[in-house]
Amino acid sequence: CRNVRIDNVTIHHSEGMAFIFQLCHNVSLTGCRIEPSENRLISSCADATHFVNCSGDILMKDCVMESQCDDATNVHGIYTRVQKIEGNRLYLQFMHNQQEGVPLYHAGDRLCLIKCGDMTAFGECRVVSAERVNGQLCCVSVDRLPEGIAEQDGVENIDRAPENVTITGCVTGKNRARSFLISCRGHVRITGNELHSNGAAIWISGDCRYWYESGPVEDVEVSGNQIECKNSGIVGWGTAAVEVVPELEQSPTYYHGRIVIDGNVFRKSRGPLVHARYVRELEVKNNRLICADAQAAEILTRCCTLHNRNNTIETET
């Protein structure tokens, strides 16, 4: 699908996700509401919105996502794994059953290859042709084999990723888990939102182990938001307001690029403000933190460069 626009649509209940977009180019949601009707407690039984290997521009503006049983949104791609190499043909496997059968590869697409252990990128190639073998497996012919390629390496289609993701003026809350999950290349702007989250408000990951959700972020700005995090201690929901936690073994380099957290108001009761690792550059500035104890101001990081300045802390009793 191309140029998908959904305006002022309300979904009161969904047995699964309320909105899911896959392999779409240019998607906008404006003024949409995912919220239960008067006699219901739950809106969607999974994520409110979900974007898989979409490209072009993704816009979410003035939307309300409340009372869903999982995250407000998740924007990501898919890692497949090399199961067999025959000449210039790669047999690629979808590793999670919820991804099986996705027509992910097309002639001309650029592929990035990674070592799944430390998720280090080591080469690129282009798709010449692609065909489906079965629900789990596809055969992709490429223009060349990157040096060092081996079975069990990970493959990401970097042409099936958004150039711009903009989330602005949205409200999330009353839900399980987290608010915004972002694992994609391109420019990401999360601005002027009101987020109420039981786990992390912003979750940036990437993994080649279980969900196989790609990929590294390159340019993320989180600014001018009102963020309230309970960080209730549920495993997998995050202990920080902003979690940047790629699932990898010890890596010799960074996985994510530049992340800026600027001019937000955070309200937290426990856990650190930011937990980030394997990030090239992290900037935390001009934020106001209202918290119950000093631990909530901590920034736990294993980043190449950290800029932490002009943040204020107010302690509540």
Where are these regions (language model features)?
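Extracellular parallel beta-helix/beta-solenoid repeat domains
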Residues: C1-T317
